[in-house]
C-alpha cells in the first residue's frame, strides 16, 4: 500500500481491492513501529478506525470522493475539536480548541481520515524540528539527522511511509525545507489560496498551509481539496479553483526557466549544485528554455524576513499570558508575576529569542530603522520577483544550501539555522507559490529542487514538477530500501 500514489490508493479503495479500515490499520501499525522517529504528538486511533468503517460504507455505495477513506496527518498547529492543539509548546500542552480549522473541516467533508497530529518546531519557529517541547523528530533517511522544520513531523511521517500524505505550514520554508531533507514533495501555495482560519499564527502575513506527499501528482489532488475562499479568513482570496489533477495532465510546452547565478554560492554544497545543474540540463533536453537571471536583492532576503517574522511573532504570541488560555504559572503572587512567570515557563528558548527580537525591532527608536525599513525592502523584493517572473515561468534552484544536518549540530548556533532558509523565504515575503521536489542524493541524503512561480500559478508549477517526475525516479526512492 505504501508504494501507491494517492490516485492509485483512491482507485483501489473504490474498487474494493482493500478497505479503508485495512489501510488505516496499516498506517497505525507503521506509526507504532516507528515511534523512534517521534513524528507524532497525538494519535486518534479509535476514531480513525470508526471513520474508516464509515468510509467503507460510503465507498461500497459508490459515493466516495477522491480522498474518501485515505488516512492523513495534520501538523499540530491546526485547531481540532477532538485532539489537543499544542503547537509543540509547553504553553499549549493541554489546550483543546473549541472548533475545527477550516482545513480540517474540508478534509472531513472530502472523506479523509485524520489519524493524528504531527510534531513540529515550537510555534513553527525553527528549521530542524529540535525546538519541540515533545522532543526532536528524526529523519527517516538517517535517524541521527534532522528532518527539517518547522513541519518536520509531517515530512517524516510521509517519508517514513507512516501516512500517504500530511499537512504542514510554511512561513519561511517550513514545508519546502523538510520536504527537501526528507526526499518528498511539498508545496507552499500562493498566500491567500488556502484558508488560515484555525491555524495558530506565527507571522500572519507570511504563514500559509500546504501539503506533503510523494509526488507533484499527489500534491495536486490534495491542493484541489483545500484551496478556496473562506469568509472566516480575511486574507483568503475569492477566485475560481481549477482542477489541479486535470491541469497537470495537460501537455507542458514552451517552459521558460529562470536560473539565478546567486543560488550557486560557495556555501551551497557541491553535490547540491551538481544535482540542480543536472535537473536544469534535463529540463533543457526536454525542450525548456533556460534563461539566466539576476536577483540583485537576494542577499537581503534572510535579514528582511527575520525582522518581519519576529515582529509579527512578538505581536501574535502576546496573547499567551497565562490568563485566558495556555500554561499558567503556579508561582506568582501578582498579575505581573503571573504573566512573566507563565511566559518564562511556557515558552522555549527559540521562541523567547524571536519574541525578544521582534519586540526590539518594534520598539520606539528602532521601529523606523528596522521594521519599517524591512517592509520597504520586502516590497522591493516582491517587485523584483514579479518582474522576473514576467519573463520566465518558474525560477529554479536548490531548496536548501545543505542536505540534512546532524541532530544537535546547529542547535546552539541560531544564525546557521536561519541560513537554512536562504532560498525559501523569498516566496513567503512575496506571497508566491513554490514547490520542492526530490532531485538526487548526496552521501545517501536527499536533495531538494525548488520551483517558484507567479501568484496563483499552482497549475503551471505542479505541471512542470510533474513533468520532471515523469522523467526521473527520485520521488520513488524509499528510505526503507536504501543501499
From Swiss-Prot:
InterPro entries: Amidase (IPR000120), Amidase_CS (IPR020556), Amidase_dom (IPR023631), AS_sf (IPR036928), GatA (IPR004412). The keyword Ribonucleoprotein does not apply. GO terms for cellular component: glutamyl-tRNA(Gln) amidotransferase complex. SUPFAM superfamilies: Amidase signature (AS) enzymes. The active site is at residues 75, 150, 174. Allows the formation of correctly charged Gln-tRNA(Gln) through the transamidation of misacylated Glu-tRNA(Gln) in organisms which lack glutaminyl-tRNA synthetase. The reaction takes place in the presence of glutamine and ATP through an activated gamma-phospho-Glu-tRNA(Gln). PANTHER family: GLUTAMYL-TRNA(GLN) AMIDOTRANSFERASE SUBUNIT A (PTHR11895:SF151), TRANSAMIDASE (PTHR11895). Heterotrimer of A, B and C subunits. This is Glutamyl-tRNA(Gln) amidotransferase subunit A. It comes from Legionella pneumophila (strain Corby).
Amino acid at each position: 500500500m505504501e508504494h501507491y500514489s494517492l490516485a492509485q490508493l483512491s482507485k483501489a479503495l473504490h474498487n474494493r481491492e482493500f478497505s479503508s479500515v485495512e489501510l488505516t490499520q496499516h498506517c497505525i501499525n507503521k506509526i507504532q513501529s516507528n515511534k523512534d522517529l517521534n513524528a507524532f504528538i497525538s494519535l486518534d486511533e479509535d476514531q480513525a478506525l470508526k471513520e474508516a468503517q464509515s468510509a467503507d460504507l460510503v465507498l461500497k455505495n459508490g459515493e466516495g470522493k477522491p480522498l474518501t477513506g485515505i488516512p492523513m496527518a495534520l501538523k499540530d498547529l491546526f485547531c481540532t475539536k477532538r485532539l489537543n492543539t499544542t503547537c509543540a509548546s509547553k504553553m499549549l500542552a493541554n489546550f483543546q480548541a473549541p472548533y475545527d480549522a477550516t482545513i480540517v473541516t474540508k478534509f472531513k467533508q472530502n472523506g479523509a481520515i485524520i489519524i493524528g497530529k504531527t510534531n513540529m518546531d515550537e510555534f513553527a519557529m525553527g528549521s530542524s524540528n529540535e525546538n519541540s517541547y515533545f522532543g526532536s523528530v528524526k529523519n527517516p533517511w538517517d535517524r541521527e539527522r534532522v528532518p527539517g522544520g518547522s513541519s518536520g513531523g509531517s515530512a517524516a511521517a510521509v517519508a517514513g511511509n507512516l501516512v500517504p500524505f500530511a499537512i504542514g505550514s510554511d512561513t519561511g520554508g517550513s514545508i519546502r525545507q523538510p520536504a527537501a531533507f526528507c526526499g518528498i514533495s511539498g508545496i507552499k501555495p500562493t498566500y491567500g489560496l488556502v484558508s488560515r482560519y484555525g491555524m495558530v499564527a506565527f507571522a500572519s502575513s507570511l504563514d500559509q498551509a500546504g501539503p506533503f506527499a510523494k509526488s507533484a501528482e499527489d500534491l495536486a489532488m490534495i491542493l484541489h481539496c483545500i484551496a478556496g475562499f473562506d469568509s472566516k479568513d480575511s486574507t483568503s482570496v475569492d477566485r475560481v479553483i481549477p482542477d489541479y489533477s486535470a491541469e497537470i495532465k495537460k501537455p507542458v510546452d514552451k517552459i521558460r526557466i529562470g536560473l539565478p547565478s546567486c543560488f550557486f554560492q560557495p556555501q551551497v554544497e557541491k553535490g547540491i549544485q551538481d544535482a540542480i545543474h543536472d535537473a536544469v540540463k534535463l529540463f533543457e533536453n526536454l525542450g525548456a528554455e533556460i534563461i539566466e537571471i539576476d536577483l540583485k536583492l537576494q542577499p537581503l532576503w534572510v535579514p528582511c524576513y527575520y525582522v518581519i517574522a519576529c515582529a509579527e511573532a512578538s505581536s501574535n504570541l502576546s496573547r499567551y499570558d497565562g490568563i485566558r488560555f495556555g500554561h499558567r504559572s503556579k508561582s506568582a503572587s501578582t498579575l505581573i508575576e503571573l504573566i512573566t512567570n507563565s511566559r518564562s515557563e511556557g515558552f522555549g528558548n527559540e521562541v523567547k529569542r524571536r519574541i525578544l527580537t521582534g519586540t526590539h525591532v518594534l520598539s520606539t527608536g528602532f521601529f523606523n530603522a528596522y521594521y519599517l525599513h524591512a517592509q520597504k525592502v520586502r516590497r522591493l523584493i516582491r517587485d523584483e520577483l514579479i518582474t522576473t517572473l514576467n519573463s520566465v515561468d518558474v525560477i529554479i534552484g536548490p531548496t536548501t544550501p545543505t542536505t540534512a544536518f546532524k541532530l544537535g549540530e546547529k542547535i546552539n548556533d541560531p544564525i546557521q539555522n536561519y541560513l537554512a532558509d536562504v532560498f525559501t523565504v523569498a516566496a513567503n515575503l512575496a506571497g508566491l507559490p513554490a514547490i520542492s521536489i526530490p532531485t538526487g542524493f548526496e552521501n545517501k541524503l536527499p536533495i531538494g529542487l525548488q520551483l517558484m512561480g507567479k501568484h496563483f500559478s499552482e497549475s503551471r508549477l505542479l505541471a512542470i514538477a510533474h513533468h520532471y517526475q515523469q522523467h526521473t525516479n527520485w520521488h520513488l526512492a524509499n528510505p526503507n530500501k536504501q543501499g
